[in-house]
Amino acid sequence: MGIYILYVCASENDRLQQLDFIILGGGASGLQLAHRLSKSDACKASSILILESDQHKANDRTWCFWETGEGEWDDLLQNQWSKVQFKSQSIDKTIDLGDTSYKMLRSKPYYDLLHKNIAQNKSIQNKYERCTGFSDKGSHVIVNTEQNTYQCSTLFNSIFDWNILRQQLQYPVLQQHFLGWYIKTPTPVFDVQKAVFMDFTVPQKQETRFMYVLPFTKTDALIEYTLFSEKLLDKSEYESAIRDYLKEKNINDYELVEVEQGSIPMCSYPFWKHNTKNVHFIGSAGGWTKASTGFTFKNINRKTIALVDHISANKPLSRFAKKNRFWWYDLLFLDVLSKHNHMGAQLFSGMFGKNSPKRIFRFLDEQSHFFQEILIMRSFPTLLFVKQFFKRLFGTHH
């Protein structure tokens, strides 16, 4: 481990570089896994190759998460809030998070820091090559790019493939799709202490639609129009919704500084079933996105730590990914939301209206106890969820 070996493969007559780990994709999960492997006593001398197609990563992502006290990424935060607001036609609730904060991290400083840290480890290479395929040979993995062929003991793949979801019918597929405007106003209009977590007072149009407002200063904020639904909108429809929302808030004079747009898969599909002896899917490609909310970053933190501990203990990768009760909760929620997409505001209003903030955020963070989860579930229309549970149980959910 830690030594790059070049040898001649007689069958292909190619010189292949033998590596311990190859990581496909240099995004949040790939870089963080490489970083943690490089810091692990058991793995820090391992030879690691990160393959990514884009050398110029900018602020292509914004990650938000709840955290109590100080955290690993605090020095990189764009902002954090001690209060969040939930609003719908039936409830308007500002939640004091106490010793917990809602934190926002933009991707560029994160990428820059991890690339800097990784560059200090001579056992890690970073190459900008597009992967064209890979194959688990049992004793090793062959990885092909447009320029080269590589061989490794273990491959971690963070490249998400939408076709996996499109080619199956067993699990409903929604998207958390959004368009956000970073705006600057000439006069103070924003409450910097409070993030608007969900504002369902916007027209729902028989879907689950809400506004998300993250103020950085009294004159700077991200205004994001978000949907949990099956199909994307035309860009003009997102933009029109944001304009209408700002107009309703009497924010008419502003400069559009930056635009952010994206789509996150919301599905309980068991991505881990594509893992093999030596190939492990990570990040959204591995099902690390919280299916019912689209949150990913906190899971990446937990999963990369657990995965490196797992590898360090010489445990087989096949034993790493397991279903838990939260997977089932997400599956039932998405079953209901996909069939009754117009009920999203009602479902979230019930949860936020009938539960304490601590209970809600522990539940969404998959850190709650079973009794707390029972109380959360009582917030939802019981008959609807029980009916869907039995459909799943007896395989009649289609």
Residue ranges and their predicted role:
Residues M1-D20:
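Extreme N-terminal leader/targeting segments of oxidoreductases
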Residues L19-K44:
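N-terminal Rossmann-like FAD-binding beta1-loop-alpha1 element of flavoenzymes
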Residues I50-S88:
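N-terminal FAD cofactor-binding segment of flavoenzymes
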Residues W81, Q85-I91, R106-Q125:
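N-terminal Rossmann-like dinucleotide/flavin-binding domain of flavoprotein oxidoreductases
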Residues L97-K116, S229-E237:
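Short beta-strand to alpha-helix junction loop
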Residues Q125-L246:
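Predominantly flavin-linked oxidoreductase catalytic cores and closely associated redox partners
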Residues C131, P203-K205, S229-A306:
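FAD/FMN-dependent oxidoreductases across multiple families
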Residues I305-H398:
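C-terminal helical "tail/cap" subdomain of flavin- and related membrane-associated enzymes
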